Amino acid sequence: MSLTREQLAQQIVDAGRFLYGRGWSPATSSNYSTRLSPSEALLTVSGKHKGQLGLDDVLATDLSGNSLEPGKKPSAETLLHTQLYSWRPEIGAVLHTHSVNATVLSRLTPQDFIEFEDYELQKAFSGVSTHESRVRVPIFDNDQDIARLAAKVQPWLEAHPDCVGYLIRGHGLYTWGAQMSDALRQIEAFEFLFECELKTRSVMNRQG
């Protein structure tokens, strides 16, 4: 049974309160979305505090990122959300967060990816059934030109259909799922892994 627009908007509001409460979406940073229809998405409007969202703080867009609601301004990063809905029709929710761990780890990693292996919590990601796997998370350099950034992301997505998320350097994390609960689960898993990685590097640096 399909959810109504109001139910989907409430999911976004609830996600904002949860993610703000965990410190992963401070102030007016971050943006969230759900799929509204095969050709439409419901996204947070620009400039709103994510811990204080209301049902009117979302708007519908087409999959080219154009607002379908006059008077409401979509986030500058809308295209990165709609790109994912166009890429895989089974994606039902996309979350973009600005946590300290994601920001710092992406800045400290000189490579264009980070890889996680042998962590039990990798099984929290869709399609991963064992810790004996590798989860590679690409890191793209930040770019204020979102269309140009999306053009860099697209080839990775096409070459890695099992991708579960990506980082923007010094900026934050994008992840997604079939529904909002899946995307939220993956946010938590990523944050756990990011913290483990940072602590591991800290210990190794002290030992070195």
UniProtKB/Swiss-Prot annotation:
Enzyme class: lyase
Reaction(s) catalysed (UniProt annotation): 5-(methylsulfanyl)-D-ribulose 1-phosphate = 5-methylsulfanyl-2,3-dioxopentyl phosphate + H2O
Cofactor(s) required, per the database record: Zn(2+)
EC numbers for this chain: 4.2.1.109
Molecular function as annotated in GO: methylthioribulose 1-phosphate dehydratase activity; zinc ion binding
UniProt cofactor note: Binds 1 zinc ion per subunit.
Entries under SUPFAM superfamilies matching the protein: AraD/HMP-PK domain-like
Coiled-coil zones: none
GO terms (BP aspect): L-methionine salvage from methylthioadenosine; monosaccharide metabolic process
Chaperone keyword on record: no
GO cellular component: cytoplasm
Superkingdom as given in the UniProt entry: Bacteria
Binding sites annotated in the UniProt record for Zn(2+): 96, 98
UniProt keywords, alphabetically: Amino-acid biosynthesis, Lyase, Metal-binding, Methionine biosynthesis, Zinc
PANTHER family (alphabetical): METHYLTHIORIBULOSE-1-PHOSPHATE DEHYDRATASE
Entry similarity comment: Belongs to the aldolase class II family. MtnB subfamily.
Role according to the record: Catalyzes the dehydration of methylthioribulose-1-phosphate (MTRu-1-P) into 2,3-diketo-5-methylthiopentyl-1-phosphate (DK-MTP-1-P).
Protein name: Methylthioribulose-1-phosphate dehydratase
